[in-house]
From Swiss-Prot:
Belongs to the RNA polymerase beta chain family. This is DNA-directed RNA polymerase subunit beta. The RNAP catalytic core consists of 2 alpha, 1 beta, 1 beta' and 1 omega subunit. When a sigma factor is associated with the core the holoenzyme is formed, which can initiate transcription. Pfam families: RNA_pol_Rpb2_1, RNA_pol_Rpb2_2, RNA_pol_Rpb2_3, RNA_pol_Rpb2_45, RNA_pol_Rpb2_6, RNA_pol_Rpb2_7. CDD domains: RNA_pol_B_RPB2. One of its GO terms (cellular component) is DNA-directed RNA polymerase complex.
Length: 1291
């Protein structure tokens, strides 16, 4: 038996055809969000605060220290934040201590009286200084006096210590120390929900992780085409700060070719690398000693003007470098040296980050450069004991032992350079042979010691980089591939927020220093020293405007999960899609098990937006790791799972997971297809170091949801993975018969299901709540019911447990949308036949049975939110009211007494949802008007109807209404609203959309199509046993697309349906051909799954057998109701006066260049003329045409289109005069309006002519032509031929 029965949960069992035993369980799929935010809260904020505190004043007399900090309770719950359109956040408070230390001369005379008691003098002086009488003397110890100053009873008193240094005749010289402490508000910080999202202004947002180039040292080489010499490059790239770029050069001096080494500091002009070392205070002799007189450095030193006097040489080099960095400015040698040191060695200006230091140590330490090299000297410890003998070859077997010896920092030398440069002053130095075979010439390797941990660059780093670069020509070390995932790291949510927090604190730091310098520190309070606004502003800007803060894709649970696991190379500090080449978008060998090679967008972002693979994790340095099992002597160690980065797996041979093995994990094959350094490798069993944990570890969650993925072409698999995210939740979700086994984990971690937080017993269940009793006591889970998602789909949760059930932690107890019994269910299992049908499935179109529509198989619900704000205007308050002037009772039929639509009402386009009137500008009323107003009330009031109406396509049933009133003295229970808003009313209208012609559907294999015909059940073909076919697909859609997975799926689906079983067939390790044949035979299927179909219309069988089976089909969120659109009267573009385009603008259809050619080709001159004039931008013509149609007159001759007028004005704007000449030779100005034949009196009041003044040049002749035309400001442009009310609305 090739399968086992697997229990998914208490309700679902499946036949599991998984081949690889001991499958590692999936990690928390949204851990990349939740775990890193938790790190930010506990450690990330602390790290930033440690960088800035204590804050010293400019003169050093006062210091602000941080004692502790913490989050307070959130002001709103997640549910409240969503309902009230607020931010789900919590305030951060810090306890700060301000210490001030000053020397003061205190006069003994007060109010003309000289005091001689020190305590009296000090008390009087303090009262004057602090302008306070609340000073209490506490104690005296010799010449030290201690006081307390109470500012507020609720706050801690200030402590003041005064030490008398000298008692003069008229004054006391004292040292005054003041200690103030208090709690300070640092701002509100958005919190992450349990689902890994942020609630910003009521909407769920996701911070997408960013894939960027890691800080570190990078090496490259290229051939100089002129000289034929190889040029070597090295870059040291920090996260923030100055770049150092090294390059070798080939020059000719006389007949000698020399290869000096140059460096560019922050993209400045290049200077020799040795001059930089000299500027650090390393002498010429030391440079040559460190590098054993390397010929490149000897030649480079010859380029420097060195006279042999260390001080003069140092001064010259420092000033020369300063001049190049600052583009010609000069400075003293001390000033220049200070400047160079500050841009390279100051932690505040130069930040390598932990990841950068990790990469530098990995790249520049000697142990990582000597594999397959022969050591040319004895390696000894401090006592000259030989640890590694000369002529030892370093290979795969002894590298670990040698690395451990080198980690003890043996063979290190001390560096001698300027004392004010910080950092490790040691490097490791070992000689190896340039050629391991000949063993003649040696070269020295300079590398970092294990004690290098600084997060800024050090002189040791620079020397090691130079050494690495010099040794590349002997093939010691390797050049870097920038697209390798070992050189790209992920900035997760936690790090991105930490960077924003750092920027905010940087601004606060500057403000605090200024305040300490300018304030009277005797009177200042700690609570007022810090203003949190800069921090709050930066955080708000990041969440609202950053490219990485995205409105969550919430069509279904899978799209939500994918959004949280997304990696983007775009955004600030990343790439831009215009400049990104093909290489960076391509699939790289290091993506294996880390980034999905399939799932990526199809448009301009292809390859720049990726998804994490199923088992991938991000380590503490931001590098993506993937798990492997250790293999020792051909035996798989199932209990030893190691997560490796792309760099770590480089020198290991890794086998695929589907090898043949016995029950003890012994590999049975002798030769195994493996990977080594990114290439395929046929390895012997004893060579294997690691083995994959699962065949699906290379793909993402969405991709691993495709059964028979291995039988699909990659292009179609990409479409399949992307379209699963677009499937709308259906009202009767159905889990797939043919699943891949990831459906449970995807549903559990999506954030839409309700998951048990602990082991417990279910005590109570209904449609709104589940109550459990566990270790922590009674716990209540609230279920959402018809909530609107970000994408307008409905979020409804339904319980799948009953009272008395024992639930385990992590078990799904209530399904979310698109879930069935705790499994992801984004579509329906339908009977599919691959056959043509009267041409109705031409070009991927789909023929469907009416039975599916009647049974509501693909019916979905969609919720629209309509918001009305009641404002306080300058003319008076707006009112929500039923009695709206000039509105019929028929129009108000759905409104209650308050003027708000009743819940449950079915509303159509144009119906009033909320009645609202806005006062117009009130004039001073006469006594008669006041009397009329008193008698007739609303009727005579000067108000405008501003009611909320159902827009086009918005019809449905009113599902709920939410009212939020502003907080005030009269309404203390209200919510915080902007100043001029009195009330917000939200009306939710739900639509039930059945599937119809024009809707887009797809399978999971990229087989997408539009429904072209829905046939009555009796006309659909059926099987011989009477089973009707639900969907007919075109068989021509399969061969060229090469997505054969869909054919295997229908056969397996049909067999499983007949056996009344559900199956699991995971990607790359599911059913094989033999097993498929077995299950089909078990189900009694013959002839390779092909059957005789009967034509429903004639009752005759089709000529040939047809492939019929069960396929999982999805209804996508591209529905015809959202797309179809027609324009009657609508807006025009301001300048060209042509109709706008697109449904959102109520635009027309574009009649473009090629369509004009088509009419020209037909010779349809009259049609062409009216399309280009009166139907488009002939302003006068279209108004006259409208008038002619309304009054049944003859349609007038077209005039000049406005676009021609625009062209002529643009040409005039260039300084060319343009005019028309008639047959008599008379010149006339080009005018869009024919003034002679145009009489404005013929126009009705509502036909307003508009002419913009933006395009006219200042020319008297032109002005004269237009002098009696009315000009209107751009903002007041009114459309012609609209009713008075419409014009009023649009104004």
């Amino acid at each position: 038996m090739a399968y086992k029965i697997r229990k998914i949960n208490r309700n679902v069992e499946r036949r599991d055809y998984t081949k690889v035993s001991m499958n590692l369980s999936l990690p928390n799929l949204i851990g990349i969000q939740t775990e890193t935010f938790e790190w930010f809260k506990t450690k990330g904020i602390q790290e930033v605060l440690d960088e800035f505190f204590p804050i010293l004043s400019f003169d050093g007399s006062s210091v602000l220290t941080l004692e502790n900090w913490g989050f307070k309770e959130p002001r709103l719950s997640v549910r409240q934040a969503k309902e009230e359109s607020k931010i789900y956040d919590a305030p951060i408070y810090a306890n700060l201590k301000l210490s001030v230390n000053k020397t003061e001369e205190i006069q003994k005379e007060f109010d003309g009286v000289v005091l001689d008691d020190a305590l009296q003098i000090l008390s009087k002086w303090l009262e004057e200084k602090t302008v306070s009488k609340n000073i209490t003397f506490k104690q005296q110890s010799q010449n030290s006096y201690f006081f307390e100053l109470t500012i507020k009873k609720s706050e801690k008193p200030d402590l003041i210590q005064i030490d008398i240094i000298e008692d003069k005749k008229t004054s006391l010289i004292c040292n005054v120390s003041i200690y103030k402490s208090g709690e300070v508000f640092l701002g509100d910080f958005p919190l992450m929900t349990e689902a890994g999202t942020f609630i910003i202004n009521g909407s769920q947002k996701v911070i997408v992780s960013q894939l960027v180039r890691s800080p570190g040292a990078y090496f490259n080489k290229e051939l100089n085409r002129k000289t034929g010499e190889m040029i070597y490059f090295a870059d040291i790239i920090p996260s923030r700060g100055t770049w150092l770029e090294y390059e070798t050069d080939s020059k000719k001096i006389g007949n000698d070719a020399i290869n000096p080494l140059y460096v560019k500091i922050d993209k400045s002009r290049k200077t020799t690398a040795t001059s930089l070392l000299l500027a650090f205070g390393i002498s010429k002799d030391d440079i040559l000693n460190i590098f054993d007189n390397d010929e490149v450095l000897v030649e480079t030193l010859q380029q420097d003007s060195i006279i042999g006097d260390f001080k003069i040489d140092w001064s010259n080099q420092v000033q020369e470098i300063y001049k190049k960095i600052t583009q010609g400015e000069t400075a003293t040698s001390e000033g220049a040296s200070k400047f160079i040191n500050s841009i390279l060695f100051d932690k505040r200006k130069y930040d390598l980050t932990k990841a950068g230091r990790f990469k530098l140590k990995q790249k520049l330490s000697i142990k990582n450069r000597i594999l397959n090299r022969v050591i040319a000297e004895d390696i000894v410890d401090a006592n000259n004991n030989v640890l590694i003998a000369k002529d030892t070859e370093v290979n795969k077997h002894n590298i670990k032992q040698i690395s451990e010896i080198l980690d003890q920092d043996v063979m290190s030398i001390d560096l001698n350079y300027l004392s004010d440069i910080p950092g490790t002053r040691k490097v490791q130095k070992i000689k190896v042979y340039k050629d391991s075979e000949l063993k003649t010439d040696t070269t020295c390797l300079i590398g970092l010691t294990s004690s290098s941990n600084e997060e800024f660059i050090t002189v040791a780093d620079i020397l090691s980089t130079v050494s690495y670069l010099l040794n590349l020509k002997y093939n010691i070390g390797e050049i870097d591939d920038i697209d390798n995932l070992g050189n790209r790291r992920v900035r997760t949510v936690g790090e991105l927020l930490q960077n924003q927090f750092r920027m905010g604190l940087n601004r606060i730091d500057k403000n605090v220093k200024e305040k300490l310098a300018t304030s009277d520190l005797y009177k200042v309070k700690t609570s007022t020293i810090i203003n949190a606004k800069p921090l709050t502003a930066i955080i708000g800007e990041f969440f609202n405007l950053s490219q990485l803060s995205q409105f969550m894709d919430q069509i279904n649970p899978l799209s939500e999960l994918t959004n949280k696991r997304r990696l983007t190379a775009l955004g600030s500090g990343g790439l831009s899609r215009d400049r990104a080449g093909l290489e960076v978008r391509d699939v790289h060998p290091s993506h294996y098990g880390r980034i999905c090679p399939i799932e990526t967008p199809e448009g301009p972002n292809i390859g720049l937006i990726n998804n994490l693979s199923t088992y991938a994790r991000v380590n503490e340095y931001g590098f993506i790791t993937t798990p492997y099992r250790k293999v020792i002597n051909g035996i798989i160690q199932n209990d030893q799972v190691e997560y490796l980065t792309a760099d770590q797996e480089k020198n290991f041979i890794i086998a695929q997971s589907n090898v043949n093995q016995d029950e003890n994990g012994k590999i049975l094959d002798e030769i195994i297809v493996s990977r080594f350094n990114g290439d395929d490798y046929m390895a012997k069993v004893e060579e294997i170091d690691y083995i994959d944990v699962s065949p699906k570890q290379i793909v993402s969650v969405a991709t691993s949801g495709i059964p028979f993925l291995e039988n699909d072409d990659a292009n179609r698999a990409l479409m399949g993975a992307n379209m699963q995210r677009q499937a709308v939740p259906l009202i009767k979700p159905e889990s797939p018969i043919v699943a891949t086994g990831i459906e449970f984990e995807a549903a559990r971690d999506s954030g839409e299901a309700i998951v048990a937080k602990e082991d417990a017993i279910v005590k109570y269940v209904d449609s709104k709540t589940i109550i459990t009793d566990g270790e922590s006591g009674i716990r209540t889970y609230i279920l959402s019911d018809y909530e609107r998602s970000n994408n307008g789909t409905s979020l409804t949760q339904s319980p799948i447990v009953k009272v008395g059930d024992v639930v385990k932690k992590g078990e799904i107890i209530a399904d979310g949308p698109s879930m069935d019994q705790g499994e992801l269910a984004i579509g329906q299992n339908v009977v599919v036949a691959f056959s043509t049908y009267n041409g109705y499935n031409f070009e991927d179109a789909i023929v469907m049975s009416e039975r599916i529509v009647i049974d509501d198989r693909f019916t979905s619900t969609h919720i629209d939110e309509y918001t009305l704000e009641v404002r306080n205007t300058k003319q008076g308050q707006e009112e929500v009211i039923r009695e709206i002037p000039n509105m019929s009772e028929q129009a108000k039929r759905h409104l209650d007494a308050e003027g708000i639509v009743a819940i449950g009402t079915e509303v159509k386009v144009g119906d009033v949802l909320v009645g609202k009137v806005t006062p117009k500008g009130q004039v001073q009323l006469s006594p008669e008007d006041k009397l009329l107003h008193a008698i007739f009330g609303e009727k005579s009031r000067n108000v405008k109807d501003n009611s909320l109406r159902v827009p086009n396509g918005g019809e449905g049933i009113v599902q709920s209404i939410k009212r939020f009133k502003a907080k005030s003295a009269l309404n203390p229970d209200g919510i915080e609203l902007p100043a001029d808003i009195i009330e917000v009313i939200k009306v939710y209208v739900v639509q039930k959309r059945k599937i119809q012609e024009g809707d887009k559907m797809s399978g999971r294999h990229g087989n997408k199509g539009i429904i072209s015909r829905i046939l009555p059940v009796e006309d659909m073909p059926h099987l011989e046993d009477g089973t009707p076919v639900d969907i007919i697909l075109n068989p021509q859609g399969v061969p060229s697309r090469m997505n054969i997975g869909q054919i295997l799926e229908i056969h397996l689906g049909m067999a499983a349906k007949k056996l009344n079983q559900k199956v699991i067939t995971p990607a790359f390790e599911g059913l094989n051909e033999k097993e498929l044949e077995e299950i089909m035979a078990e189900a009694g299927m013959t002839n390779y799954g092909k059957v005789t179909l009967i034509d429903g219309q004639t009752g005759e069988p089709f000529d040939k057998p047809i492939a019929v089976g069960v396929m999982y089909m999805l209804k996508l969120s591209h529905m015809v109701d959202d797309k179809i659109h027609a324009r009657n009267v609508g807006p025009y573009s301001l300048i060209t006066q042509q109709p706008l385009g697109g449904k959102a603008q109520n635009g027309g259809q574009r009649f473009g260049e090629m369509e004009v050619w088509a009419l020209e080709a037909y010779g349809a001159a009259h049609t062409l003329r009216e399309i280009l004039t009166i139907k488009s931008d002939d302003i006068k013509g279209r108004s006259k045409t409208y008038e002619a149609i309304v009054r049944s007159k003859k349609i007038p001759e077209p005039g000049i289109p406005e676009s021609f007028n625009v062209l002529s004005k643009e040409i005039m704007g260039l300084g060319f005069n343009m005019y028309m000449i008639d047959e008599t030779g008379e010149k006339s100005v080009i005018n869009a309006y024919d003034k002679k034949n145009f009489d404005a009196d013929n126009y009705e009041d509502d036909e307003i002519l508009v002419k913009t003044d933006t395009l006219y040049i200042d020319d008297e002749d032109v002005d004269a032509e237009f002098e009696d035309l009315t000009y209107v400001d751009e903002n007041d442009i009114l459309r012609s031929f609209e009713s008075e009310n419409d014009i009023d609305e649009e104004e």
